[in-house]
Amino acid sequence: MTFHVSTQAGVVRQTERHLHSDPPRREELAALADEVRAIIADAVPADVRASVVAAVGVAGTATSCAAIDQELDPYDPARVHGYRLEAGALELMLARLAEMDLERRRHVTGLHPDRAPTIVAGVVILLEALRAFGLDEVEVSEHDILWGAALTVAADTAG
C-alpha cells in the first residue's frame, strides 16, 4: 500500500445528509452518489485511482452485503470472510433495498436489523467506490482496518 486517506463518506453521515424519505427517493440516492463520487475524486488523485487493482471491504456494510447476497441466517463469519461481492450483485441489492421501507429492511435475510437504517447508503458508497477505482468486485474481510495495518507493519519489518 502506497497511499491511504480517510474521508467523510461514512454511512451514518451520508444517511443523515441525504436519505430523508422512507423508502429513499431516487433524487436522494442520486445526490448521495454524486457526493461520494466528489469526495473520492477530491481525496484520491486520478493516477492512484487508475492504479488500483483490487479492493478489500471491511466493517458493517461490506460484511452485511456479503451476508445478504448469500442469504445467511444465521450470520456465518466463515462464509463472509473472503467472499467476493460483484458490482452487478450490489446494483441488484441496491435496487431491492432502496424500494423497501425501514421496517421491511429490518427483515431482510442476512441483514442485522440494526444495520437497516444505514444499509442503503452503505451500498451506494460501496458501489461508487468500486466505480471510482474501475473495479468489478470487492473481497470482504471479517477483520478490521487495524488488522490490515498490522499486517503491513509486520511485512515491512520482516522484509
Regions found by a protein language model. Name each.
Residues 2-159:
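Helical "lid/coupling" subdomains associated with nucleotide-phosphate turnover
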